[in-house]
A protein has these predicted regions:
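Active-site neighborhood of phospho(di)ester-bond hydrolases with catalytic His/Asp-centered motifs
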Residues: 1, 12-14, 59-63, 91-107, ...
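Conserved catalytic scaffold of divalent metal-dependent phosphoesterases
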Residues: 1-82
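Short amphipathic alpha-helical surface micro-motifs
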Residues: 8-10, 43-44, 100-103, 115-117
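Binuclear metal-dependent phosphoesterase catalytic core
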Residues: 19-22, 89-94, 106-136
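Glycine-centered flexibility sites
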Residues: 29-30, 83, 102, 123
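Intrinsically disordered, low-complexity regions enriched in small/polar residues
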Residues: 38, 49, 100-103, 134
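Short secondary-structure transition/capping segments
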Residues: 38-42, 103-112
Length: 136
């Protein structure tokens, strides 16, 4: 969300953690630079710093997926989108319970397990008409 769209009293959690219902959620917004020049692209180091800032969260919520090919390939656009190697490294290191993301509209795989972590494209609900419900 862009700053000019925020209402008074709203705060964007980007590179920050918050506790909800006894679980720690970490939020990382934006995407990595690409030839497509989409809004809010940042360089790999800046993105990695935001990922590091939410290390240890129970649930990571990001816009882009981790760098896992099955999660990056868009079957309609017929191309690989950019995913984050830093996010994948954090998943392997800290093993959060879930990583929730979007960005890839028609993914080859909607979800993939990396170690103990369930990585889920929750933005895919637009195609299914059913939102993802996180059940602990």
């Amino acid at each position: 969300m862009w700053a000019e769209h925020l209402r008074p009293g709203h705060h964007v959690l980007d590179g920050e953690q918050v506790e909800l219902g006894g679980r720690t959620f970490g939020f990382v917004g934006g995407g990595l630079r690409s030839p497509y020049r989409t809004p809010n692209e940042i360089d790999d180091d800046a993105y990695a710093a935001k990922v590091a800032a939410v290390s240890g969260a129970d649930v990571l919520c990001t816009h882009i997926p981790p760098a896992v090919p099955e999660l990056l390939y868009d079957t309609v656009a017929r191309r690989l989108e950019r995913g984050s190697a830093a996010l994948l490294a954090e998943i392997k290191r800290s093993q959060p319970r879930y990583v929730l993301f979007g960005h890839v509209h028609q993914p080859l795989a909607r979800r993939v397990r990396v170690g103990r972590t369930e990585c889920i494209n929750v933005g895919h609900f637009r195609a299914t008409g059913r939102p993802y419900v996180l059940a602990w």
